[in-house]
């Protein structure tokens, strides 16, 4: 039985585990993997908006809009959204130079 399924009980005023194979390398590896999984899961739940926004938008950034008036930004967004090929309804990629 691994440490992951054992129940810790008070033994002689100390907390211990009733298992003889706690030094088994497989048990140690399973415990490390379990702890890492728990840490990663907690971080994912805490920062999922930041993480997935970074993957979704951060890796493929568009042209810089710094110094461009808001009206021109809105016009560019509308052009990007309406850039559809009428023949087969596939999106057309517009690259500005």
Swiss-Prot record:
Q: Which residues carry this modification: Phosphoserine?
A: 64, 82
Q: Where is this region: Disordered?
A: 59-85
Kindly list the residues the record flags as site (Essential for channel activity, possibly by being protonated during channel activation, and by forming the channel gate and the selective filter): 37
| Keyword terms, alphabetized | Disulfide bond, Glycoprotein, Host cell membrane, Host membrane, Host-virus interaction, Hydrogen ion transport, Inhibition of host autophagy by virus, Ion channel, Ion transport, Lipoprotein, Membrane, Palmitate, Phosphoprotein, Signal-anchor, Transmembrane, Transmembrane helix, Transport, Viral ion channel, Virion
Q: Where in the cell is it found?
A: Virion membrane; Host apical cell membrane
An annotated GO cellular component of this protein is: virion membrane
Activity regulation, per record: The M2 protein from most influenza A strains is inhibited by amantadine and rimantadine, resulting in viral uncoating incapacity. Emergence of amantadine-resistant variants is usually rapid.
Q: Site positions for Seems to be involved in pH gating, renumbered to this chain?
A: 41
Q: Where are the transmembrane segments?
A: 23-43
**One MF term in the entry's GO annotations:** monoatomic ion channel activity
- At the top level, the lineage of the source is Viruses
Topology Intravirion: residue spans? 44-97
S-palmitoyl cysteine lipidation sites on this chain? 50
Main role? Forms a proton-selective ion channel that is necessary for the efficient release of the viral genome during virus entry. After attaching to the cell surface, the virion enters the cell by endocytosis. Acidification of the endosome triggers M2 ion channel activity.
**Name assigned to this protein:** Matrix protein 2
Which species is this record about? Influenza A virus (strain A/USA:Huston/AA/1945 H1N1)
